[in-house]
């Protein structure tokens, strides 16, 4: 059994992941600010914290995790043009806190990259795509500098039960 943190665990992809990890017998902690949550009910066997990722070190200063699935970022491409401040806060400014927490915790970081960063062969297709591309590059460099173990996963056309119409 692994001790796993899922940021964005109340979102569409995250909530399905949480249910599967709990079903597999893992000890799961969910972090979410509930800005874009799924209708998928919370799993009673996981711990939920309503907070932003820049608060990880304060909330969990005495805990370590084996894995951190970082899904907790702003994830809407088109509306990112209208929510620039949110995109920068959720994706760009909070990400170093996730990296530092993963390093201190000794966790492997599984980062949800974005296929939109490949659009037109430029990361500047939208504010969302820009931040995802920047975070991907920062993660690669940070891992090289500090020895952080990581994997980047990419989701394409995700849909299914409990999908929120706003996403």
Regions of interest found by a model, annotated:
Residues 1-158:
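N-terminal Rossmann-like NAD(P)+-binding domain of SDR-like oxidoreductases, especially those catalyzing
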């Amino acid at each position: 059994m692994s001790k796993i943190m899922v940021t964005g665990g109340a979102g569409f992809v995250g909530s399905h992941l949480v249910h599967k990890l709990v079903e597999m017998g893992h000890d799961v902690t969910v972090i979410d600010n509930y800005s874009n949550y799924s209708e998928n009910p919370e799993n009673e066997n996981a711990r939920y914290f309503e907070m932003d990722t820049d608060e990880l070190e304060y909330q969990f200063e005495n805990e370590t995790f084996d894995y951190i699935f970082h899904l907790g970022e702003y994830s809407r491409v088109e509306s990112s043009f209208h929510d620039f401040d949110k995109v920068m806060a959720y994706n760009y400014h909070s990400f170093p806190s996730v990296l530092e927490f993963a390093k201190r915790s000794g966790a492997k970081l599984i980062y949800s990259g974005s296929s939109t960063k490949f659009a037109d062969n430029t990361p500047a297709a939208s504010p969302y795509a820009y931040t995802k591309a920047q975070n991907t590059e920062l993660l690669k460099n940070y891992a090289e500098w500090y020895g952080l173990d990581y994997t980047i996963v990419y989701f394409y056309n995700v849909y299914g039960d409990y999908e929120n119409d706003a996403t």
